């Protein structure tokens, strides 16, 4: 189980990313429209003004139950070993164990 502080830090990053998402998107659109290099550099400066933790690349998927940051399945929002346990216990409808 991940520490509570790490999970809270990730939630804080998600809120910041949502807050600054429109600003980043509009700045990137402006860059493609502006022909002069000096204007582009000004817009790049605006892109660097939001906090670092508001960048979408700093977000990390975590397991919904345990907060584990590795081996996450996007479809379920669970880490691999929790997913396996839940499938074995028949808690996920439609998921079957592979057998050959």
Curated annotation (Swiss-Prot):
Gene3D superfamilies: 1.10.287.1480
Pfam families attached to this UniProt entry: Ribosomal_S14
GO BP terms, alphabetized: translation
Region called Disordered, residue ranges: 1-31
GO cellular component: chloroplast; ribonucleoprotein complex; ribosome
Location of the protein in the cell: Plastid, Chloroplast
Disulfide bridges in this chain: none
UniProt keyword terms in alphabetical order: Chloroplast, Plastid, Ribonucleoprotein, Ribosomal protein, RNA-binding, rRNA-binding
Gene Ontology molecular function: any one: structural constituent of ribosome
Keyword Nucleotidyltransferase tagged: no
Superkingdom of origin organism: Eukaryota
NCBIfam families, per database record: PRK08881.1
Record-stated family: Belongs to the universal ribosomal protein uS14 family.
HAMAP family: Ribosomal_uS14_1
Quaternary structure and partners: Part of the 30S ribosomal subunit.
Biological role stated in the UniProt entry: Binds 16S rRNA, required for the assembly of 30S particles.
Protein name as it appears in the record: Small ribosomal subunit protein uS14c
Species annotation: Nicotiana tabacum (Common tobacco)
Lineage of the species this protein comes from: Eukaryota, Viridiplantae, Streptophyta, Embryophyta, Tracheophyta
């Amino acid at each position: 189980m991940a520490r509570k502080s790490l999970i809270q830090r990730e939630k804080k990053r998600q809120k910041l990313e949502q807050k600054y998402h429109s600003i980043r998107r509009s700045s990137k659109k402006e860059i493609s429209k502006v022909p002069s290099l000096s204007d582009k550099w000004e817009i790049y400066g605006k892109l660097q003004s939001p906090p670092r933790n508001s960048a979408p690349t700093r977000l990390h998927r975590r397991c919904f139950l345990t907060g584990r940051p590795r081996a996450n399945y996007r479809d379920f929002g669970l880490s691999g070993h929790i997913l396996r346990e839940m499938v074995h216990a028949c808690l996920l409808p439609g998921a079957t164990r592979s057998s050959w």
